[in-house]
């Protein structure tokens, strides 16, 4: 291999394709590359800074698999760096990840190569420009990896994050493609910028933009800046690096999955793959050039970024399993956290939205922002994100205490801390016990239950609170009664599964309870093994949301580890629903699935004992239809007819919701809400609203509460959310319908919502 290049294989995708990046620099720099890396990350250590004069630039390509020109451009960029622009490598280390999403790229490339004509057809109605569902944009599980940088739910993101933290580059550019009628977008970004972004980071975005503009102007290429793509939501390929000291940027070339080898845009211009590659290559070289010219300043400002003069402690209180899960997440981001010593202090309560007197406990978690990654801590933990502009590209609220279902506090008071030690769980299953039991409140419990069912262990759950000896069992707790078991080695299986899933089990010695029902009561029910199916795909009048479908698929396969049968919607007429007792319909756009014939088929199946689970837009299939009680809640707000044309976008956002947190009142006596408190904070990403059920159970609802929202919600729709349904359940014959108006699996990072889905499968009889 060339002495200027080193190739690093850092993992594999779900489909076992390799992930790798190239390190490119001068021979001199390559001979001391490890010293350069270590000197750079020394900025994270207090009072230690071994600054380099070498700029570190990381270029990422093809995070969206069907944005195909980007990987091609990565190879051309490496070639030019090793030939006519080798001068840039004297004081610059360039890291190039040519394809962040090989599974998506191969899905797209294989389809295109099987479909295209020779010569290629530039007419956009040709089938080579009509990518079939689900497209190549997403990864194996149909996740958008460009929204997964912070949440690291996918294996590609998890492996890349480890490498990124080894380097922490000064500049990071993320190469994308957009619609064929948009020319090229590069920095500076649009507002809003998050308030932790420094003046230098803003200024350098403008410097980069001007350098790119110089080359684009020279070549007569159109471009635009400062529009659409902001720097707020923390899980993008531009924002996450920005919150770790880099100049983070998105580059968007015209193209995408529709473009192929060439296509005529709306102006009649032939947009070719060759042109797209050239534009991306020029932008990449220009980025390296301006970084090389400012290598000293980049190093100086990078070191300054990690000096934090603020003094805020974030204190987290709640269930120990959830706290342990949060601590594991923080460890992956190399964020420091501690256990507090018991003390009383004044703190701001996230749930109460006001200052309170709070007494810490040893089981709490403390995350100080006066650490190297303090700015990232602030971004992830802040309750309310300040918006310099309410027109933003993504969700506006993501505070981690709400994500994990924990109580959050912030304080500027000093908190005395010690090292955090995770509680170790040890189980001793007594042979004299008649049953083992555990409390239901976390995905660890859900995985444990799934494992028990898959191993033919019988499990019961209680519909009423039980106190049996020293054992207290809230509703929904799982009870493994020995008399139910028919396999011989059940104790060994139970113990192994409990250890694997960090489950604490209690021994029960009698079937007679002191408080609540005895173990033989009809309110202590057997958990049934469910045959679960999900609708997928598209046909002429229906399209399942690939993102929602993928999130559910990933949840069953990678988290719950429970079998799921995938049904193609184009075959719905021929599917015998009676083979399944649970059917999930993801969000999507549905036409014929809601026609009279199919509705009768679904309704008959439900009445015979089927459980239907409808996500978000799928609820509209049944809204206002005979036999179903769910109804769309209309927004009665009228549009301002006197608005100026130039103010139209501002007028529209008054009816807009990109993503905000809502306080939801929960009926936790209902099986759908077992394991939850009476308040739940839900991430709402759609302006669709539904009336409370008149026939059924309003398990989760938004009441008339002025302090119920966190994040941006348009003024004209805010009122419409009041007194609306979030989670509902109605009975039809011997079966059930579950309505999830909010996506409890949104990007699979909203951890506290996942138990609702498990409850809907196993606890709704």
Language model feature labels by segment:
Residues 144, 174, 252:
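Acidic active-site catalytic centers that drive phospho-/nucleotidyl reactions
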Residues 1-83, 87-93, 147, 153-155, ...:
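Intrinsic-disorder/low-complexity accessory segments
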Residues 124-143:
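Aromatic- and acidic-residue-enriched carbohydrate-binding clefts of CAZyme catalytic domains
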Residues 94-108, 649, 659:
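Short, conserved secondary-structure transition motifs
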Residues 164-178:
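Proline-aspartate-enriched helix->loop->beta-strand connector
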Residues 97-101, 111-112, 175-182, 618-619:
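Short, solvent-exposed turn/loop segments enriched in Gly/Ser/Thr/Pro and often Arg
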């Amino acid at each position: 291999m060339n002495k200027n290049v080193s190739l690093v294989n850092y993992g594999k995708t779900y489909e076992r394709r390799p992930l790798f990046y190239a390190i490119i620099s001068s021979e001199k720099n390559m001979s001391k590359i490890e010293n350069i890396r270590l000197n750079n990350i020394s900025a994270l250590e207090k009072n230690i800074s071994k600054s380099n004069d070498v700029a570190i630039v990381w270029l990422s390509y093809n995070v969206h698999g069907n944005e195909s020109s980007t990987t091609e451009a990565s190879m051309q960029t490496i070639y030019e760096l090793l030939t006519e622009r080798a001068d840039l490598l004297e004081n610059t280390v360039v890291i190039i990840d040519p394809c962040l999403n090989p599974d998506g790229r191969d899905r797209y490339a294989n389809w295109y190569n099987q479909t295209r004509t020779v010569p290629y057809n530039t007419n956009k109605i040709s089938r080579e420009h009509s990518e079939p569902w689900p497209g190549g944009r997403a990864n194996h599980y149909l996740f958008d990896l460009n929204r997964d940088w912070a949440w690291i739910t996918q294996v590609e993101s998890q492996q890349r994050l480890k490498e990124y933290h080894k380097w922490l580059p000064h500049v990071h550019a993320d190469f994308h493609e957009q619609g064929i009628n948009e020319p090229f977008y590069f920095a500076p970004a649009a507002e809003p910028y998050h308030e932790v972004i420094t003046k230098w980071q803003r200024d350098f975005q403008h410097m980069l933009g001007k350098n790119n503009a110089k080359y684009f102007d020279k070549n007569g290429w159109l471009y635009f800046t400062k529009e659409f793509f902001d720097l707020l939501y923390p899980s993008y390929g531009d924002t996450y690096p920005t919150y770790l000291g880099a100049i983070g940027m998105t580059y968007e070339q015209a193209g995408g999955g529709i473009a192929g080898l060439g296509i005529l845009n709306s102006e009649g211009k032939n947009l070719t793959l060759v042109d797209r590659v050239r534009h991306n290559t020029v932008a990449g070289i220009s980025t390296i050039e301006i970084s090389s010219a400012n290598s000293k300043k980049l190093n100086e400002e990078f070191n300054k970024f990690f000096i934090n003069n603020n003094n805020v402690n974030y204190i987290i209180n709640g269930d120990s399993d959830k706290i342990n899960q949060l601590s594991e997440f923080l460890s992956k981001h190399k964020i420091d956290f501690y256990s507090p010593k018991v003390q009383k202090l004044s703190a701001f309560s996230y749930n109460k939205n006001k200052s309170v007197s709070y007494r810490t406990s040893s089981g709490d978690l403390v995350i100080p922002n006066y650490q190297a990654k303090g700015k990232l801590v602030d971004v992830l933990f802040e309750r309310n994100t300040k918006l310099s502009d309410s027109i933003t590209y993504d969700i506006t609220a993501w505070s981690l205490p709400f994500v994990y279902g924990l109580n959050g506090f912030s304080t500027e008071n000093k908190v005395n801390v010690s090292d955090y030690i995770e509680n170790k769980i040890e189980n001793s299953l007594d042979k004299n016990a008649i049953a083992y039991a555990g409390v239901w409140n976390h995905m660890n419990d859900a995985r444990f239950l799934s494992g028990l069912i898959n191993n033919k262990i019988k499990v019961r759950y209680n519909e009423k609170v039980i106190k049996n000896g020293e054992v207290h069992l809230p509703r929904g707790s799982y009870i493994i009664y020995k008399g139910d078991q028919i396999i011989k080695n059940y104790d060994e299986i139970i113990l192994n599964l409990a250890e694997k899933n960090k489950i604490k089990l209690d021994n029960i010695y009698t079937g007679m309870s002191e408080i609540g029902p005895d173990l033989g009561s009809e309110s202590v029910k057997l958990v049934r093994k469910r045959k679960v199916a999900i609708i997928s795909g598209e046909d002429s009048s229906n399209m399942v949301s690939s993102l929602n479908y993928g999130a559910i698929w990933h949840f069953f396969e990678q988290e719950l580890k429970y079998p799921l049968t995938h049904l193609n919607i184009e075959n719905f007429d021929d599917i015998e629903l009676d083979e399944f007792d649970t059917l999930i319909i993801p969000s999507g756009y549905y036409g014929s699935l809601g026609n009279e014939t199919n509705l009768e088929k679904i309704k008959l199946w439900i009445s015979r004992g089927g459980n239907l689970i409808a996500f978000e837009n799928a609820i509209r299939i049944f809204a206002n239809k005979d036999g179903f009680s769910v109804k769309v809640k209309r927004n009665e707000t009228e549009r301002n007819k006197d608005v100026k044309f130039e103010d139209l976008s501002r007028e529209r956002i008054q009816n807009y919701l990109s993503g905000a947190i809502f306080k939801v009142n929960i009926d936790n006596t209902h099986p759908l809400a077992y394991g939850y408190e009476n308040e739940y904070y839900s991430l709402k990403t759609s302006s669709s609203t539904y009336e409370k059920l008149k026939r059924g159970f309003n398990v989760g609802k938004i009441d008339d509460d002025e302090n119920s929202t966190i994040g941006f919600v348009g003024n004209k729709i805010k009122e419409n959310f009041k007194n609306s349904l979030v989670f509902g359940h109605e009975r039809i014959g011997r079966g059930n319908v579950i309505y999830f108006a909010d996506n409890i699996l949104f990007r699979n990072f909203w951890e506290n919502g996942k138990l609702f889905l498990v409850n809907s499968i196993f606890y709704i009889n």
